[in-house]
């Protein structure tokens, strides 16, 4: 089905049934697939990997390494990949707050991905999505607004590359 992933509506509609109930034994395979899709050359296959990995946030298969893998795509030139990364981190904040919160910082400008942080454009999108969420407590929203106020405004924040 990967060749048919040609736009964001298709990738966002995928909802793996193996995340629920007795099919949870399939989660390790799903995790491996997602991580593989995220390094694919195709934009919407990368997005699919991020979106489906999001479904593992509330399962025993969640790993902090998933945050690192998704963050590796945060500097993508592809708008739809960056939006998926922002969405993932906003969702991670609601389901895995302790693991996700350190990533709500500006990435080291040296380009190293060893320490938590996201590029400004992606971080601004993630913060905005989290602030707009009804599942994020008001106190945390105030912290996020403070983070957003320190971020540089970028003319490319609304630009779509394809």
Where are these regions (language model features)?
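Alpha-helical scaffold domains
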Residues: 1-162
């Amino acid at each position: 089905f990967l060749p048919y992933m040609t736009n964001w509506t298709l990738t966002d509609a995928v909802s793996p049934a193996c995340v629920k109930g007795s099919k949870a034994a399939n989660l390790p395979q799903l995790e491996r697939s997602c991580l593989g899709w995220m390094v694919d050359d195709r934009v919407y296959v990368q997005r699919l990997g991020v979106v489906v990995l999001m479904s593992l946030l509330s399962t025993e298969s969640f790993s902090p390494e998933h945050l690192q893998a998704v963050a590796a795509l945060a500097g993508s030139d592809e708008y739809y990949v960056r939006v998926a990364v922002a969405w993932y981190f906003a969702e991670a904040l609601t389901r895995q707050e302790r693991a996700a919160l350190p990533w709500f910082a500006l990435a080291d400008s040296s380009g190293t991905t060893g320490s938590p942080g996201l590029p400004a454009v992606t971080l601004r999108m993630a913060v905005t999505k989290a602030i707009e969420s009804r599942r994020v407590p008001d106190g945390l929203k105030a912290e996020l607004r403070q983070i957003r106020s320190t971020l540089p405004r970028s003319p490319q924040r609304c630009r779509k590359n394809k």
